């Protein structure tokens, strides 16, 4: 009798393990399917005029150009969607520039990883920068190199998501930043507890699907997640996947344009573009 019970328990364990394996495979298959139509059409192009420290990326619908940052010395970089440099704009009020997000009408939100400061700025065609607003999100008393690395913005409801890189990954949801009052900052614990990535190095909001694109250079992956944190797509950033000839070693910024093209920048100065064979 005892042997029979042991056998039944053993059999149940095998069935449970098999079900878990099948479900895991199904989830992975579904995740891959989210990006299955994408291929690299620009594969690790060096950005001429930038030598190192490229970090973060955003697309401007106003100019149909991309804006990136160099963290040290703090500099905003504008380039074409082909990865060609247009101009550089030095900033003298930021210590460690890490994120940039276009919010419309020549305005951007940037963050300083060194002191957790967030700026709303305007940038005109003459490369003149004006600070419109500054706030701080106190992550911890002693600044580290694990501050904000990802920033996503929904123009639909003017919500920002600021992603702390790691140790641990944290997500701060900010509303009211673009108004003169009603500023609200909260930890998005529902979103952050779902992450399986080793770190967050960049982020982007996809208004077409109301989802977030979250980049990880340590995991060498790009995930698409719902605002509740459910993973619905994953792209491997390794050699042989999605037309890549080499691993993207240190992916630092992610942007998407209104045609669904995905742009990634990686240190020291590399540019990637992924294009879908059909609209998403």
From Swiss-Prot:
<protein>
    <recommendedName>
        <fullName>Uncharacterized protein YjiK</fullName>
    </recommendedName>
</protein>
<dbReference type="InterPro" id="IPR009722">
    <property type="entry name" value="YjiK/CarP"/>
</dbReference>
<keyword id="KW-1133">Transmembrane helix</keyword>
<keyword id="KW-0812">Transmembrane</keyword>
<keyword id="KW-1003">Cell membrane</keyword>
<comment type="similarity">
    <text>Belongs to the YjiK family.</text>
</comment>
<dbReference type="GO" id="GO:0005886">
    <property type="term" value="C:plasma membrane"/>
</dbReference>
<keyword id="KW-0472">Membrane</keyword>
<feature type="transmembrane region" description="Helical">
    <location>
        <begin position="5"/>
        <end position="25"/>
    </location>
</feature>
<dbReference type="InterPro" id="IPR011042">
    <property type="entry name" value="6-blade_b-propeller_TolB-like"/>
</dbReference>
<dbReference type="Pfam" id="PF06977">
    <property type="entry name" value="SdiA-regulated"/>
</dbReference>
């Amino acid at each position: 009798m005892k042997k029979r019970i042991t056998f039944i328990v053993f059999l149940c364990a095998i069935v449970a393990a098999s079900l878990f394996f099948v479900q895991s495979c199904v989830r992975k298959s579904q995740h891959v399917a989210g990006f299955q139509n994408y291929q690299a059409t620009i594969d690790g192009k060096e950005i001429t005029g930038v030598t190192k420290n490229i970090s973060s990326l955003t697309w401007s619908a106003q100019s149909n150009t991309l804006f990136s940052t160099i963290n040290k010395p703090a500099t905003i970089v504008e380039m074409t969607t082909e990865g060609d440099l247009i101009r550089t704009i030095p900033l003298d009020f930021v210590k460690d520039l890490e994120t940039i997000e276009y919010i419309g009408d020549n305005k951007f939100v940037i963050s300083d990883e060194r002191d957790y400061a967030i700026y709303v700025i305007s940038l005109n065609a003459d490369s003149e920068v004006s600070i419109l607003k500054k706030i701080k999100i106190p992550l911890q008393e002693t600044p580290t190199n694990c501050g904000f690395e990802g920033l996503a913005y929904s123009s639909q409801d003017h919500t920002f998501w600021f992603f702390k890189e790691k140790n641990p990954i944290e997500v701060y949801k900010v509303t009211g930043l673009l108004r003169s009052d009603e500023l609200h900052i909260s930890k998005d614990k529902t979103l952050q507890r779902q992450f399986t990535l080793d770190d967050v190095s960049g982020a982007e909001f996809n208004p077409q699907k109301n989802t977030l694109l979250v980049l990880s250079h340590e995991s060498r992956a790009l995930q698409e997640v719902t605002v509740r944190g459910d993973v619905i797509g994953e792209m491997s950033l390794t050699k042989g996947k999605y037309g890549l000839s080499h691993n993207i070693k240190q992916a630092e910024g992610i942007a998407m344009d209104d045609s669904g093209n995905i742009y990634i920048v990686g240190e020291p100065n590399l540019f990637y573009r992924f294009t879908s064979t059909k609209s998403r």
